From Swiss-Prot:
PANTHER family: ELONGATION FACTOR G-LIKE PROTEIN, TRANSLATION ELONGATION FACTOR G-RELATED
InterPro entries linked to this entry: EFG_II, EFG_III, EFG_III/V, EFG_IV, EFG_V, EFG_V-like, EFTu-like_2, P-loop_NTPase
Name of this chain's protein: Elongation factor G-like protein
Region annotation G5: where it falls in the sequence: 267-269
Residue intervals passing through the bilayer: none
Keyword GTP-binding: yes
Gene Ontology CC: peptidoglycan-based cell wall; plasma membrane
Extra remark: Was identified as a high-confidence drug target.
Record keyword Nucleotide-binding present: yes
Length: 714
């Protein structure tokens, strides 16, 4: 990339701002393949940061610099590139469009104050993008729509515009119309043509008059409806021509309020529309001063008064992304909400995920409060870091080698520690069991997983104590693929995916007696232990009870604990299909001992054998874990989801309306039927549904399903 960075925009000349009023933080969102990363290339060229654009297919773009992104030719992580236009610093936040990487999208939304919804002219709007628009509406985030890929063979601007308006509402109106190698401004009624990176202005052709007038009328009415001047509509309807400057002023206010959403067509390959888009971003989108800060608390959880987005206010910043680079080490991407960050200063680092979310992520992100020294500050241009003397309120920067700060942590003045309420991260719901291909790589695997979990809050690492498996909880197959790819290429660990074992359990269906006999007397010191036990089932959750009813010293007192130890060891191994036995009472009734050959080990073996014989004398049932799930699904897919849940042995508990044509389905489903549900639900509802899950209880597995498990264990 270095050969494409203009000399005047090189490492020593990163765009800077004197205060939050000179910053715009813009996140690009939309479907995968919509052209977000390529659009950023075109904007960087338009702002003369780059001399020419890079290519996704060639792996040369600014924002897709990760090895996995280059190989897969799609974004998998958040990236930031900044430019200066008309005296304003614009931080462009690129996010992945694929649903598996929604954690990166969430971080991008947190870092930004406004959003560009990027829609390809040959594709339209998908369901997750519609849901995201509703989410942004609920928090009042200012938005604009960019229709890209105007030069695609199947491009249809009119259809894409209609799809955006159908999905996002009637306040989505174009400011420009595409025309040949340029755009027609609907307010200025001028044609802007692009050639050799330059924009020229001329009068549109007469053949465009009708469509200009139609679109211009709708635009003007839309702007006037959002005007704070209530007399403007009356004057307009009375035939008065409203001055263009008045319309522009009202337009900019409505965009900043998040009540009007301009549409800008852009052809990234030719640069058409890039300057118009930058004008909307710098003049219409609000500065960080106009965007409310996240909720602020003390480390003890006490609400704190809202801080001003001001350079001189107390420091309040947040780590929105953490990466590990093999050459420069750990890099933290930080959004400054108030105050100023300077190099060689000490800040307080607070992480309080579990305080806010009940421990949901505390296994990989434990609560912590500690001081840390700031080293080198820089402004990111994708992977390239450009030195920063200071970072003002509202800006985004990169900080190298923060050893204690993790994604989601708050940085504040050590004299007045504060905590920002973390943004809500989606729970990873796809379990993938893995093992190091070579046993010698197990330590490297542990290190690599620890570092990846610190970087990615949507990745959860589980060391399952019952199944003895390492389980990655991921957002989907693509997310899991990137994790495995990174382990192999960054940490040099070859990993095998193995069959996931659901932690089933076994219990006795009825009372049974067992005789355990472990006798070996072939000369020398032998082994001698005999015991008789009775096994009784207990209610769910009762655990294990051991009773001693031996009379007459048939089993010497010192060996009775060994019988229990042997029973417990066999319970851990299972007596039916290799799963732990739970909820039983074992009563030691009788036994025999030898004055010389009896030993601790002999009675342990006798206890284990007695339990196995008791199991053979009665019915042993498998218990399976049941989860309660809550599925949020568009109404159009409710029938399909209900049918699918039924096929998974699910019991529907009820449904309720969630608004925005969505329904919540609550059901209980066996865990064994949910191992791929994150993938299947996405396919079933075209990516528009989501679900949560929580453990409910264990209950007997149906005999047909249990028989398949037993056959597999055999």
């Amino acid at each position: 990339m270095a050969d494409r960075v203009n000399a005047s925009q090189g490492a020593a000349a990163a765009p800077t701002a004197n205060g939050p009023g000179g910053v715009r933080n813009v996140v690009l969102v939309g479907p995968s393949g919509g052209g977000k990363t390529t659009l950023i290339e075109a904007l960087l060229v338009a702002a003369k940061v780059l001399s020419r654009p890079g290519s996704v297919t060639e792996g040369t773009t600014v924002c897709d610099f990760d090895e996995a992104e280059i190989r897969q030719q799609r974004s998998v992580g958040l990236a930031v590139a900044s430019l200066a236009y008309d005296g304003i610093k614009v931080n462009l936040v690129d996010t992945p469009g694929y649903a598996d990487f929604v954690g990166e999208l969430r971080a991008g939304l947190r870092a930004a104050d406004c959003a560009l919804f990027v829609i390809a002219a040959n594709e339209g709007v998908d369901e997750p993008t519609k849901s995201l628009w509703q989410e942004c509406s609920q928090v009042g985030m200012p938005r604009a729509v960019v229709i890209t890929k105007l030069d695609h063979a199947r491009a249809n601007y009119r259809e894409a515009l209609t799809a955006a308006q159908d999905a996002f509402g009637d306040k989505v109106l174009p400011l420009y119309l595409p025309s040949g190698d340029g755009l027609i401004g609907l307010l200025s009624q001028a044609l802007y043509e692009y050639a050799d990176g330059k924009r020229t202005t001329r009068t549109p052709a007469e053949s465009d008059t009708e469509r200009i007038e139609e679109a211009r009328g709708a635009l003007i009415e839309g702007i006037i409806e959002e005007s704070e001047d209530e007399s403007l509509m009356e004057r307009y309807l009375g035939g008065e021509t409203i001055d263009e400057s008045v319309l522009i002023q009202d337009l900019e206010k409505a965009v900043a309020r998040g009540s009007f959403f301009p549409v800008i067509p852009v052809c990234s390959s030719t640069g058409v529309g890039t300057l118009e888009l930058l004008e909307v971003a710098t003049r219409g989108f609000p500065s960080p001063m106009e965007h409310p800060l996240p909720e602020v608390f003390t480390p003890q959880g006490v609400p704190h008064a809202e801080l001003a987005c001001d350079n001189d206010a107390p420091l309040l910043a947040e780590v929105v992304k953490t990466t590990s680079d093999p050459y420069v080490g750990r890099v933290s991407l930080v959004r400054v909400f108030s105050g100023t960050i300077r190099p060689d200063t000490t800040v307080h680092v607070s992480g309080h995920f579990s305080s806010f979310f009940g421990g949901g992520t505390s296994n990989t992100h434990p609560d912590h409060d500690e001081d840390e020294r700031i080293g080198v500050l820089s402004f990111p241009l994708g992977k390239q870091q450009r030195p920063a003397a200071a970072v003002v309120a509202g800006d985004i920067c990169a900080i190298g080698k923060l050893s204690r700060a993790e994604t989601g942590d708050t940085l504040s003045d050590k004299a007045e520690p504060l905590v920002l309420k973390p943004w809500t991260m989606p729970e990873p719901l796809l379990p993938i069991a893995i093992a190091a291909h070579a046993k010698t790589d197990e330590d490297k695997l542990s290190v690599g997983l620890g570092r990846l979990a610190a970087e990615d809050p949507t990745l959860r690492i589980e060391q399952n104590q019952e199944t003895h498996q390492v389980v990655l909880w991921c957002m989907g197959e693509a997310h899991a693929g990137v994790v495995l790819d990174t382990l192999a290429n960054r940490y040099g660990v070859s990993v095998d995916t193995i069959e996931l074992r659901v932690p089933l359990r076994e219990t006795f269906a009825g009372n049974a007696k067992g005789h355990g006999r472990h006798i070996k007397q072939s000369g020398g010191h032998g082994q001698y232990g005999v015991c008789d036990i009775e096994v009784e089932p207990l209610p769910e959750g009762s655990g294990f009870e051991f009773l001693d009813k031996v009379v007459g010293g048939a089993v010497p007192r010192q060996f009775i604990p060994n019988v229990e130890k042997g029973v417990r060891a066999q319970m851990d191994k299972g007596v039916h299909a290799g799963y732990p036995v739970v909820d039983i009472r074992v009563t030691l009734l009788d036994g025999k001992a030898h004055s010389v050959d009896s030993s601790d080990f002999a009675f342990q073996m006798a206890g284990a054998l007695a339990l196995r014989e008791a199991a053979a004398a009665t019915k042993v049932i498998l218990l399976e874990p049941i989860d309660e799930i809550s599925v949020l699904v568009p109404d159009d897919f409710v029938g399909a989801v209900l049918g699918d849940l039924s096929s998974r042995r699910g019991r529907v508990l009820g449904t309720e309306t969630a608004g925005h044509d969505r329904t919540v389905i609550k059901a209980e489903v066996p865990q064994v039927e949910l191992t791929r549900y994150a993938i299947d639900l996405r396919s079933l509802a075209h990516g528009a549904a989501s679900f949560t899950r929580s453990f409910a209880r264990y209950e007997p597995m149906p005999e047909s399903a249990a028989a398949r498990v037993k056959a597999g264990a055999g």
